[in-house]
Amino acid sequence: MADPIPDRYQDIRDAVRRLCVEFPDAYHRRIDHERGYPEAFVEALTKAGWLAAMIPTEYGGSGLGLAEASVVMEEVNRSGGNAGACHGQMYNMGTLLRHGSKQQKALYLPKIASGEWRLQSMGVTEPSTGTDTTKIKTTAVRSASGDRYVVNGQKVWISRIQHSDWMILLARTTSLAEVKKKSEGMSIFMVDLRQAEKHGMTVRPIENMVNHETNELFFENLEIPAENLIGEEGQGFRYILDGLNAERTLIAAECIGDGRWFIERVTKYVGERVVFGRPIGQNQGVQFPIADAYIEIEAANLMRFKACELFDANLPMGEIGRAHV
């Protein structure tokens, strides 16, 4: 499947493809079979600077937008890889970049850009509150001294904990009964995962059939320094949407990459598979569903870039949901 010409992202596509060629199908099949993590692949993406695409240049990143980041994720999947192993670092940037203080950005971003730290995890979902985020029950109570928050509660389906140094955590700092709007009273924190595992956070891996590990988290009087609060207390729901909007768009791009991978593979196959003396690709009953899939992928691609345009312009993100679907 040829890309539209001219493609202003062609240089990015070519560079990512050159990297991905070094990790062929056999590599990703082995990782999947072993239920492992593509450590070498993620490290290569990090060293090449692709996972720091959205980090400003003054912090060691590339200073690119969501559109460029989405092309990176698309090409990873289009090459047969699994961007789900590392896309968290891309979309978690949205919350930190837009709402972190200058001091927080100076502390975290250079080390994330260099690969010294990984920010792959986001703690939002809870057992009884999946899509209705405003009903979360995990609490973060500020101590009497004011220098820390004490976290209690539970999260579920939290990915890449074992392969991340930091996690963005959403917790209630004001009870639901005390706020005027249910979207108020939640706050965002940066959590040092290695320290948290020693001082109040328990990780319980969940056996699953998806393409990456995921976990339950239990918090029992976990103390987080007050300086790890991102933005204003109580505004976390609004802040987390920046990360979630980026997440939806990046996953849409990955799905487009998957679709293009399948179209390319099936087109090659139906041209080679011969039945009754001719390739099966000459049968319209085979051609039609491939053509339909191609059309759907191209439509999704247009919606993806519309969503990127809105995000990068900091405009309302109503298009994001449709891009993800």
What do these predicted regions represent?
Residues 123-127, 152:
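Cysteine-centered functional microenvironments
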Residues 129-130, 156-161, 209, 246-250:
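Glycine-rich phosphate/pyrophosphate-binding beta-alpha loops
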Residues 61-64, 131, 228-233:
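Cytochrome P450 core scaffold surrounding the K-helix E-X-X-R motif
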Residues 1-84, 91, 99-104, 115, ...:
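Alpha-helical interface subdomain recognition
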Residues 138-142:
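A structural signal for short hydrophobic beta-strand segments in well-ordered beta-sheet cores
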Residues 147-201:
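A short core secondary-structure module
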